[in-house]
UniProtKB/Swiss-Prot annotation:
Pfam families cross-referenced by the UniProt entry: FLYWCH_N (PF15423)
Domain of life: Eukaryota
Record's compositionally biased regions (Basic and acidic residues): 98-107
Residue stretches of biased makeup (Low complexity): 120-130
Stretches for region Disordered: 1-36, 86-139
Organism for this UniProt entry: Mus musculus (Mouse)
Protein name stated in the entry: FLYWCH family member 2
Coiled-coil regions, chain positions: none
PANTHER family in the cross-refs: FLYWCH FAMILY MEMBER 2, FLYWCH FAMILY MEMBER 2-RELATED
Amino acid sequence: MPQPKPSEQEGESMKASQEPAPQPGTDVVPAAPRKPRKFSKLVLLTASKDSAKVAGAKRKGVHCIMSLGVPGPATLAKALLKTHPEAQRAIEATPLEPEQKRSKQNLDSDGPEDNGGSGVSSSSSEETTVLPEAPSTSP
């Protein structure tokens, strides 16, 4: 029985184990492009000299936040609070509930630490907005 040629052996073993590698010069094309991520209704606008465009944007309810750098979440939140006083009132009212729950829990667990923490939080309205940092700063 004659032995098969080396090229035939390679072809048979390649079919059994894997597909042949793409030839040099051919590009691999992705199957489908990704869908763009959806963003909230917050729109960043650039400065425009055309007052008609600005007036049109104001009529549509688009709020402009201008920044020279990459804004962080705190910067965007402050800008939104300045443009939406109703949202500011809603956000300020929301943290009061977790703070009240925390103060009740602290009364049950630790008496001395609660006396220091409750005196500071009741006298300062700014600390209400910085609730996540309050536990990490306590001794």
